């Protein structure tokens, strides 16, 4: 009977030590395991734009009951880059080397803002700018296709996300040329996102 008690005690101690050791290893490996447990994010695109577009359409059409055959999309992947039609202003701004959507800042005079105030004071104006290509969703691809087929009119909906402020600075105060103080609400952006 004494042997069983000793064996049970040794087993209990060994399992406790093993449990503590596993927890410590898990905490030490947490740096390496952290990204695997983090929410999924889309990796930055490194493929050729034509191949990426083909992959997007393939993902869009996968499983759709009235899906177009994927071989209809193959001419897009085989297209030789050449002279294209003139790009629109949004496409020119979001050229391939453009920075991603983010907060930018510029020091400007209040009168340059065009809000009707005459002042020589300068303010730090924060604004949102950048490309939102990584934020394109299946919705955007589907809407773009419907617009191409003229099922949705152009002015009704946008088929791509825009870099916009999601939060604003509380207020900005300044003195005009007549020595009066003015306070403007939500003049500068505080946070930006692709919406």
UniProtKB/Swiss-Prot annotation:
Q: Tissue range of expression?
A: Widespread distribution.
GO CC, one annotated term: extracellular space
- Please give the function described in this protein's UniProt entry: Growth factor that supports the survival of sympathetic neurons in culture. May regulate the development and maintenance of the CNS. Involved in the development of the neural crest. Might control the size of non-neuronal cell population such as haemopoietic cells. Acts by binding to its coreceptor, GFRA2, leading to autophosphorylation and activation of the RET receptor. Heparan sulfate-binding is required for signaling.
GO MF terms here are: glial cell-derived neurotrophic factor receptor binding; growth factor activity; heparan sulfate binding; receptor tyrosine kinase binding
This chain's protein is named Neurturin
Q: Which residues form the signal peptide?
A: 1-19
Query: Which BP terms in the Gene Ontology apply to this protein?
Result: cell surface receptor protein tyrosine kinase signaling pathway; cell surface receptor signaling pathway via STAT; glial cell-derived neurotrophic factor receptor signaling pathway; nerve development; neural crest cell migration; neuron projection development
What gene does the UniProt entry assign to this protein?
Nrtn
Principal location:
secreted
